[in-house]
Structures are given as C-alpha cells and as structure tokens.
Amino acid sequence: SKDTPPSSVFAIYKELEKDAPKPRFTIGIVDDVTNLSLPEVKPAPITSAEGTVECKFWGLGGDGTVGANKNSTKIIGDHTDKYIQAYFQYDSKKTGGVTISHLRFGDKPIKSPYYINQADFVACHNPSYVVKGYKMVQDVKPGGVFMINCQWSDEELAHHLNAEAKKYIADNNIQLYTINAIDKAIEIGMGKRTNTILQSAFFKLANVMPIDDAVEFMKAAAKKSYGKKGDAVVEMNYKAIDAGVDAVHKVEVPASWSNPEADPAPKELTGRPETVKMVRDLMEPISKMDGDSLPVSAFAKNPDGQFEHGAAAYEKRGTAVTVPTWDAEKCIQCNQCAFVCSHATIRPFMLDEAEVKAAPEQTKLADTKPKAGEYKYTMSVSPLDCMGCGECITVCPVGAIEMVPQESQADQQPVFDYLVANVGKKPGMPADNTVKGSQFNQPLLEFSGSCAGCAETSYARLITQLFGEHMYISNATGCSSIWGGPAATSPYTVCLLYTSDA
C-alpha cells in the first residue's frame, strides 16, 4: 500500500485548523485533477523517539544488501538493549532491481510505520544509482552520513554526482564517504559479494554500537554460518569484515558545491514520439523510485494501466560491474553466446559495405567464417543493459569472450545502438531454424526485468526470434508476469496479445 509519512498526517491537522476545511480530501498523492489532495507539510516535524538512529540502504536485488541488514539487526538485537525496526522495499524487478532497506534502532519503543526520509545514515551500494541521479542523499538529515560504494576517485565522484546532490551535501553539512568494496571483494576472493564489507563499514560510520564489539559479533556470526565450509571460507569472511572497517574514505566536500555548475542537458531520446514522451514523463521517475512524486495528471493518458511497449530499452540501468568484451580473432561465429543471453544484450550482426562505412570507428569487425564473404561479422554488447551474469563466457567453446569492468566498455554502447537501429537481415544468412541463424533475427523481447542468467527469458526471447509477430502469449502468474509486464517498462517491442491470470 502507499506510504503515509508524517508530512501527510500533519497536512490533515493543518487543514482542520482552517475556518472552512475541505469536507473531502486525499493524502499521499498530488491530485491536480480533482484538487482534493492536501499539500504535505515540509519539512515535517521529526516524530521518532529521541535517540532513534535511522538508516537507509540502497542496494541491488541479489547483491546481499537485504541479507546483510537482517544480519545487522540480529547482531544489534542480540547484543544490545535497543529496540529495532526493519522494513525492506523492492521495485518490480527480480534480482538486479532496486532494494531499499529501512532500519531504525533506539532505546525507546519505535512507533514509526512509514518509510525513512530523515535518516542519520544513507548508503548507496551500487554506483549506477549515482550516475542515474537517484534521490538518495536528500533523505539524509543535516550533519548525517552518506556512504557510496564505488571505484571512483574523489574527482571522478564529483563528475558523477549531479548538481542537486552536490548542493544538498554542501548546504546541509553531509558527511560524505566512499568505499571501494567492489575491488576489495575481488581481492579477498569473494567475487561480486560486497555485502559483508559494506556491513562492517555501516557499523563503523553509523555509531549504533562500538565498532570493536560489532566486528567481534560479525566474526562470530560468520564462524557460525560458514564453519562447516572450512577455515578458508571463514577466514575470507574475517578479511571482508576487517576490510570494511579499514577501507572507508572520507571525502572533503568543496565549498564550490554550494553553487555547483548546472548539469548537462539530458541525452536526446530517439524512437516513436509517444514512447519517448512516456519514458520522460513516467518511466524515468518510476525507475528511480520517485514515482510517488508524480501528479495524477501524469497518468491521464494511461487510466487503464496500459503503457507504450518497448520502453525497457530506454532504462539503460548499468548495474553490472563487469560486462563481456568480444575477441574477433578467437571467435568461430557460432552465436551460442547470443543464444543463451537472458536479456538480449549480446547480439551478432552482418554488415554490408555501406553499413561498415557508417558504423562508429570503434566497431570490431571480422570476416565471415568458415570462409570470407561479402559481409563483415560482429558480435556487439550493450554494456548498460547487460546484467553481468557471465553465461556467454560459460557457453563459448573457444574463450572468445571475457568479462571486463563496465566503464571500460562505454565506447561500445554507441556501437550497439547503431547496429540495432541500422543493421538487419541479409540474403544468404544461415537458416532461421538453426542456433546460428536464429540469432540474426531481431528479438521482440529485450532487456527484461528477469534475474541475471535467467533461462526462462532466454527461451521466451528465442521464440520471438523464431515466430515474430505470429504469436499469442497466454501467461500464468509467476516470474514471467513480473519480468514481462511491469508498469511503464515493457520488454516486448511489439504489441503482442498478452493474457494473464494474475
């Protein structure tokens, strides 16, 4: 149900103070159609009990953030006399979507049945949220702490933070920290699992309990959880706990952030005008978990919940830490990597002479195999849509693909966009009913909200390549109704008949 913050409740009392209050009203929405909504009282008075510490964590579904926060609440609950409240908020994606953890700790009973929006501590566990401009730091109280997990230097961080965030940080004396849990996890041997490192960093910065005690209790919990897996695994977790304490870096906030330079104009979107408008007006704020700020009038053209199809291609979530890069010399052009890709983010193309000339100069090309023909071959990756599952590497028989940092592949996004928009089927290509030939067909399901490496979307995407628009989809409730029909971000690129028993 919709969150009811104190600002909405105070709005009711403010309305009742009037000589002629509205006999009918709504709260929690901006109703500019019937004009029955009450304006929220901002800033709302702090209603939490004195001494309550409020913390908010922005994570990525499947990255361990929620699990780590549940573990933190257990440690604090078992070893202190504090009251605890924990609530976990999710978007409509499976793994790889936004998770927001709301944690409260205090010496008095906690009676706050609403999201945290005046936090003592906010953590961003995925740097893509900073790049996309999510409103995170705006929920930090003046003088509070904002921690970002990223691989950036202070100068690079300044480049990625938008003007609104910089000004809020400077004007409200926000204590800004970064931690590179991404590289630390790889160095320790934990791969993508940054949650333990970030959990100990939280204990260091949030001052909920003495850090030495927190480290001791975290290590005891790790011993209990992983003891059966051997001393090496336990020791790895010990190193991660210590790393989180030691790797926190304080960023000195420049005075210039109080008057930051304006952000560059947003990139111009291409596509059907009605889709572009829907993306700008609805999809972008919804994707940033800011949909509650939209007025009722924003949905005037969508009263029945129908949205333009193909909008998932505009999300460009950029959540993968590592993405594939293709080695043209090693590749045997079997197309198996594209065949197994769950999100249609790696695709083969054959280019004629004119398409080669018009392609971006960084396009990697190879002669067709087993013998050279009139076309050039390429395997292209969309780094901002890839989920980083690595299935393409697993299936490649010759090691022609490797995973590299996403930011190193930024120049390949224009290549992918050009190929999708301008390069199509050619005469003489392999048959559609083969693994290789099917992957030259345009998928009609792309960039869905399924889990990284999901086999279900691989099958569904393949069917659209084999049968195209000659389809009727009868869908049972489950994962497929979540990744296939989320509000405003449809992964289907054509208007298919779609029924569900949801």
For the regions a language model picked out, list residue spans one by one:
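Flexible loop/turn segments at secondary-structure boundaries
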Residues: 2, 63-67, 92-95, 130-132, ...
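Mobile "lid/hinge" segments at catalytic clefts and subdomain interfaces of large enzymes
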Residues: 218, 487-492, 496-497
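Iron-sulfur cluster-binding cysteine motifs and their immediate structural context
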Residues: 312, 336-356, 382, 387, ...
